[in-house]
């Protein structure tokens, strides 16, 4: 079905999507099934009209904005480029009521500016940006507007119009919290589906939800037992796609997508990195996707947010916990007594021990790790968000996706297993344009990671302590347990299996 884009007074009408253009397996639908799926009116084709104010900007101003925020847009189609939406005043004027919650923000983030016009125009989009860059509203606002444009706000028979898949319960709940604020103003129902809780209430909420935010495992379960029909989904988002593949959800995701309409679906993918496994997934289920990259080359070595001041202290293993207490006493005093500090440990047992230690030192502390049930995790996160707890002790279950505002300091008590996880951890501070601070306690047992860490520090123009340099600057070549140092020659991403490791 054609998509119409109006750009600076001219019309662009790309060709209809063809099922043969897709490389995915199992995407064909029998005529009878297709007829059933078309029982309800589909979400209408997208029409994007650029605002006059945006058109009045000079090309020099547009180029300067793109360069300032390191925005790169790659589009293999012949469609004319769409200008980034630099100001909220440049948003489409129709259904302006949904923009009311934006009043608390000063301007769109770079990923929002670059992807909004493409998504409003109905294009498939791959967004590559650091966590904390405003991705939820980047895909959420076009989702809500698309449903409003269709005139099919009310849903029934557990047939949602849009599905957003995220890797963790915590991230799914965050997305739900943001989108429900926008949906409530226009009577669009949003529901959140995740594991660890009973299914009955979720089944009931699915009956009338227009937008479903879900983790892949629970969504697959509810789909298998007939609680939800994805045959009417016209807008699909895969958020933190790289993280979902890391967690072994590739087959679940493929099965879920194959149950959705093929030719009338707009697909959006957001990811922090761009490994071959994510590229393969995008090529399988997306059509002529536009890639929007914020920052440097996502396939290169991991890079930390340059707004984060990184400090690495080389200490003895037995000194770490005492040094942690000193750092917290120093950081939480005077005007900063209520500042939020996120403390990362490597294993669950370590996190429990550190949490107990800090509680004995009279810090207002909460914890989040794999041994806690959903209610306990939610309680800890809420305590941290509201300020009832100013220190949150976490394992890497919280390293990606959690949107906790105003984290002033991240402390790594134990260095993670990879430098990529290090970058994700410290990315919890310095979000939404703010400055951040991260302190890492590095020991001799972590020396295999010294070279990679030094590269991250140097790339962000941070100081590299002499004690860290003594461990060496060599970056250890990645190895695979079965294929050794030559694992890159073997594509292991084709048959991902869900494996859960003890933290």
From Swiss-Prot:
InterPro entries: DEAD/DEAH_box_helicase_dom (IPR011545), Helicase_ATP-bd (IPR014001), Helicase_C-like (IPR001650), P-loop_NTPase (IPR027417), RNA-helicase_DEAD-box_CS (IPR000629). A motif (DEAD box) lies at residues 239-242. Residues 307-472 form the Helicase C-terminal domain. Its main location: nucleus. SMART domains: DEXDc, HELICc. Residues 1-25 have a biased composition (Basic and acidic residues). Its EC number is 3.6.4.13. Coiled coil: none annotated. Residues 116-292 form the Helicase ATP-binding domain. It is found in: Nucleus, Nucleolus. One of its GO terms (molecular function) is RNA binding. Residues 1-35 are annotated as: Disordered. The keyword Zinc does not apply. ATP-dependent RNA helicase required for 60S ribosomal subunit synthesis. Involved in efficient pre-rRNA processing, predominantly at site A3, which is necessary for the normal formation of 25S and 5.8S rRNAs. This is ATP-dependent RNA helicase dbp3. It comes from Neosartorya fischeri (strain ATCC 1020 / DSM 3700 / CBS 544.65 / FGSC A1164 / JCM 1740 / NRRL 181 / WB 181). The lineage of its organism: Eukaryota, Fungi, Dikarya, Ascomycota, Pezizomycotina.
């Amino acid at each position: 079905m054609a998509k119409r884009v109006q750009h600076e007074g001219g019309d662009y009408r790309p060709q209809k999507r063809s099922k043969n253009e897709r490389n995915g397996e199992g995407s064909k639908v029998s005529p009878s099934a297709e007829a059933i799926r078309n029982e309800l009116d589909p979400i209408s084709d997208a029409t994007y009209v650029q605002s006059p104010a945006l058109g009045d900007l000079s090309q020099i101003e547009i180029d300067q904005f793109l360069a300032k925020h390191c925005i790169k847009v790659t589009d293999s189609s012949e469609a004319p480029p769409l200008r980034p939406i630099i100001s909220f005043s440049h948003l489409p004027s129709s259904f302006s009521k949904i923009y009311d919650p934006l009043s608390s923000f000063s301007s769109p983030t770079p990923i929002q500016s670059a992807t909004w016009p493409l998504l409003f125009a109905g294009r498939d989009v791959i967004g590559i940006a650091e966590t904390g860059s405003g991705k939820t509203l980047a895909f959420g606002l076009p989702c809500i507007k698309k449903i409003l444009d269709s005139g099919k706000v009310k849903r029934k028979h557990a047939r949602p119009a849009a599905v957003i898949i995220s890797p963790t319960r915590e991230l799914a709940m965050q997305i739900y919290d943001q989108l429900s604020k926008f949906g409530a103003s226009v009577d669009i129902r949003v529901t959140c589906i995740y594991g660890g809780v009973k299914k009955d209430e979720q089944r009931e909420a699915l009956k009338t939800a227009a937008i479903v935010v879900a983790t892949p495992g629970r969504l697959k379960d509810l789909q298998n037992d007939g609680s939800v029909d994805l045959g009417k989904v016209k807008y699909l988002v895969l958020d933190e796609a790289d993280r979902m593949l890391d967690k072994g959800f590739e087959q679940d995701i493929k099965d879920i997508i194959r149950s959705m309409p093929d030719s009338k679906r707009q697909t959006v993918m957001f990811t922090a990195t761009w490994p071959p496994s994510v590229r393969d997934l995008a090529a399988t289920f997306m059509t002529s996707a536009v890639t929007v990259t914020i920052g440097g080359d996502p396939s290169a070595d991991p890079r930390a947010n340059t707004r984060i001041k990184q400090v690495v202290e080389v200490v003895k293993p037995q000194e770490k916990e005492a040094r942690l207490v000193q750092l917290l006493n120093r950081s939480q005093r005077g005007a900063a007594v209520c500042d939020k500090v996120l403390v990362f440990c490597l294993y669950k047992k370590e996190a429990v021990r550190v949490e107990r230690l800090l509680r004995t030192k009279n810090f207002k502390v909460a914890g989040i790790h794999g041994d806690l049930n959903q209610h306990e995790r939610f309680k800890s996160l809420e305590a941290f968000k509201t300020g009832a707890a100013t220190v949150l002790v976490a394992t890497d279950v919280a390293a990606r996706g959690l949107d906790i505002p105003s984290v002033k300091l991240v402390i790594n008590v134990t260095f993670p297993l990879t430098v990529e996880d290090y970058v994700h951890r410290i990315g919890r501070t310095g979000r939404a344009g703010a400055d951040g601070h991260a302190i890492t306690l590095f020991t001799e047992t972590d020396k295999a990671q010294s070279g990679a860490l030094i590269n991250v520090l140097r790339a962000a123009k941070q100081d590299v302590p002499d004690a860290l340099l003594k461990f060496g600057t060599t970056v250890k070549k990645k190895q695979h347990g079965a294929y050794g140092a030559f694992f890159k020659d073997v594509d292991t991403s084709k048959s991902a299996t869900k494996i859960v490791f003890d933290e």
